[in-house]
Design a protein with these regions (language model features):
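Partner-binding and oligomerization surfaces adjacent to conserved cores of proteins
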Residues: 1-255
Length: 255
């Protein structure tokens, strides 16, 4: 089972409509959903930055012969700008991720079984998964050249367009699922296997999440600071609703 993690914020942060982002994120869990934004919905303004000067020069110099290649290139880039991106981390104990994405350790992290998550999203014919890959971290932006276009190397081009980030982000250990469409999608609830609570998450919010997700057989952990160190570790905490009726909604068989 391959695991990956999605960090979510704590209470107190509102969206543009004045609604609680914390309650929104819990509601998507309750409803067995996730949201896929385009690259422009991600937090790094340099998402999708790449170099194509050499390619553009080729188009200019060989304009008489390169029309079809340029047309194909523009078609690729238009498509990639609109794909759905689900960003996850391979790490549940990175203090920077807890600080940035989980409201200073007051939020939570969702543990996914990536295999089940991929299966359930592929089962959704509208989602249409394209690829999954680890983000590559570089000091310089990736380059697009004529060999990639001529070879119709969609995977390699997609990685350079939406799978490469500055080396400053390497601590995130990011893995991305890329889909043809964007928006809210239903998933198999079994794809969520555990919830990790930030070390500063109030007990009331922990109870709120457990009550909302009762009956799903989830494991729960709370992050704690290891004495006399900068490290954090996850300690399992008891489910407060162990005898709740078993949750069975939208359980999918992929056989």
């Amino acid at each position: 089972m391959t695991k990956a993690y999605k960090y979510r914020g704590g209470r107190g942060i509102l969206d543009k409509d004045g609604k609680s982002i914390f309650e929104r994120d819990v509601a998507t869990l309750v409803n067995n959903q996730l949201y896929l934004p385009t690259k422009d919905g991600l937090n790094d303004p340099t998402e999708g930055v790449y170099g194509d000067d050499a390619l553009r020069m080729f188009f200019k110099v060989f304009s008489k012969y390169s029309h079809n290649v340029e047309e194909q290139y523009n078609k690729f880039t238009d498509k990639f700008r609109n794909v759905g991106v689900y960003s996850l981390s391979k790490s549940f104990d990175n203090e920077l991720l807890w600080a940035y994405y989980a409201s200073g350790h007051t939020g939570f992290a969702i543990e996914y079984d990536i295999d089940i998550l991929e299966q359930s999203l592929n089962y959704n014919t509208y989602a249409k998964q394209l690829y999954k890959f680890d983000v590559e971290y570089l000091n310089d932006v990736p380059q697009i050249d004529i060999s990639i276009i001529r070879g119709n190397e969609i995977v390699e081009m997609l990685k350079r367009f939406i799978g490469t980030k500055s080396s400053s982000w390497a601590h995130e250990k990011e893995v991305r699922l890329i889909f043809e469409n964007t928006g809210l999608f239903e998933i198999d609830f079994k794809a969520v296997t555990a919830i990790y609570f930030g070390c500063r998450m109030p007990d009331g919010d922990i109870n709120y999440i457990m009550e909302k997700l009762k009956g799903r057989g989830l494991k729960y952990f709370k992050m704690v600071n290891v004495n006399n160190s900068y490290r954090f570790e996850a300690k399992e905490v008891e489910d407060k609703y162990p005898n709740a009726p078993k949750f069975v909604a939208n359980c999918v068989s992929y056989d």
